[in-house]
Amino acid sequence: MGYNCINKKDLSGKVFTIPTNDANPYIKLHANINKPITAMTMCQRFNSGLERGQTLFSLATKSADNELMLYKSSLGTYRVHVRLRSLDFFNLPDGINEWISLCWTWDSKTGLTQLWLNGKRSARRVISPHGTITGEPSIVLGQDQDTYGGGFDPNQSFVGDVTDVHFWDKVLSPCDIKYYMHGQIKSPGNLLNWEALQFTTNGKVFIEKSDFIC
């Protein structure tokens, strides 16, 4: 499977647009990860017209395909995967054809995980306590990795716009997450930083201007 050359860009004010419903388009993100992940926060904004399930974030290693995976099952229902285990969150604030600001946190010490959507948070749940994510990660936007870097299913693909993707190796404070929800960043992600993003694209993926804040 070939990739285009690695880009490193400040994508402030830009979005990735994936307009087609198939297994070809995706974005591979190249993260600055040099130690095991024992806590994390991943934030992004997305806008999609799909009602079916779709994958928002997929991190695989050579030993496990669903090390970290965030899947929108249906309107208001989201599934998180950590270390091959999964949890469903229901009745979350959601919408179609509108911007959704989302953050997902997980701390291996306790296993506590939580979702934030448009400023409102879910209840905290427990998944994979004391788990550690090791090995070279493959991080993909737009598709679910059923194998390391591949195994894509078009029925789980994302169609729409995604922007402001940040990934930290810690759980952000509620105040920092609320800043993000309002379009501000106190400190960019140290693993993935939208303002200095390293990425490759495959298939019909376009970089367009964002209308989240005008």
Residue ranges and their predicted role:
Residues 1-214:
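Extracellular glycan-associated modules
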